Amino acid sequence: MRYSFIYKVMGLCYNYFTKHTQRIVNYNIFIKIVLMKVKRMTDVFSIQDFKFPTNFLWGSAVAGHQVEGNNIHSNNWYNEQQTLKVNPNYEVSGMACNHYNMYREDVLLLKELGHRAFRLSIEWARIEPEEGRFSQTELDHYIRELAFLKENGIQTFVTMVHFSVPLWFAKKGDFSNLENIKYFERFLNYVVPKISRYVDFWNVLNEFNLGSTQQKLDFKFNSVFFHARGYHIIKQYSDKPISSAHALVQYYGRRQNDVFDVTMQHYNDIINHEFFFHAMRTGELVLPHKDGVFDKELKNTVDFWSINLYTRDIVDARKKDFRGERYDFTKTRMLPMNFYLDEFYPECVYHNLNRLLDKPVYITENGCSCYDDDFRIVYLAEYLSAMNEAIKSGVDLRGYLYWSFLDNYEWSTYIPKFGLVEVDYENSFKRTPKPSAYFYKEIIENNGFSQKILKKYLKNMPRVDTSLPIII
């Protein structure tokens, strides 16, 4: 049962309640009371069967620093070690999933599970560990991995920078300093021509678009130019489609009848999303506290929309960072920690993709972090259903990459479990596909959702385990 339907009947229910009980109740309180009694998730057993378009591309995604291990020359590795010095309990990436040494096993498992595409990143810190010193040995490693993916019939999405960068580059100010674009150009000119024959889709950068502080606004402003320059360099060596992965969060005013919350809802959308879409379509870059810029080099520097989307963020205009508390009655506790992705909100798929009707769309990240794998199956059913609705409304959605193929290092902890495949860190990094991996495999084989597939893997709707201790 989705809230959009509930709200339509709320007025009738409220009128009936007040008439027959002769009690006057605040309408917003009434809504909250009712919604707390509603299931937090759709009854997925009521979803009708549906198919995806022919040649729809199915797969999964990872990021180098989160799965490879021993990324010792990166800024992330350095920051982890510095944090560990002051907090002995801090979890560092370490060996991560040991994907660097186990990529052949992982590729064969991808093939076994039916994946036809795989998104991975090139770790710049491995390729250029010191300024101006390039490692052909490390580049050869990525060439072997990409070649092995292609040999096994798996299309590749390659991200040139997925957050982590060489420590020396970070010390120079990374993407916050436009003067550093020459180092990025040099890196791309070294790597791209050597790997281009193995790449089907390119992501220049990953998720540089979020944040509202002045520092983040400056970072985003400059990153658009890094993206555009990367696009033009890659085009010199490859005719495959290019984009940058965009974190498309739906912003939602906490009080929808409050002019301040709704205004800041739209403001957050502009500074985190529309600024990029507008720049790609027109060449005009507009962000607060910066003079607008028109640069023809920016225009049309995406061949497709590469979209990472998970849920919504609540906006509260009365908070200095505009971050509102999520509604308690929509949270789904699936981990022994407070986690920002504790709400299922598939509406964000339909809402967000319908603003991207001018180019093909690939969802390059979407996933659920949970200990009870049944939640992941429900999540997939809900979000795939929303994708189907978006396609029916005219969105040219051509592919879906689940995040993540493996349980991995989530930047500061191993507690979140996004993976279709479990990794036993205490037992030689043994890989064990979860039931959701086989559910997803049958979705891929069927090129669509069916109740027959669902009922094979899900017997009942999962319930929140309130006994899970909060570790952090």
Task: Locate the predicted segments by residue.
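Catalytic domains of carbohydrate-active enzymes, especially glycoside hydrolases
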Residues: M102-E123, N300, F304
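Short, positively charged and aromatic/hydrophobic N-terminal segments
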Residues: Y14, V25-K32, K37
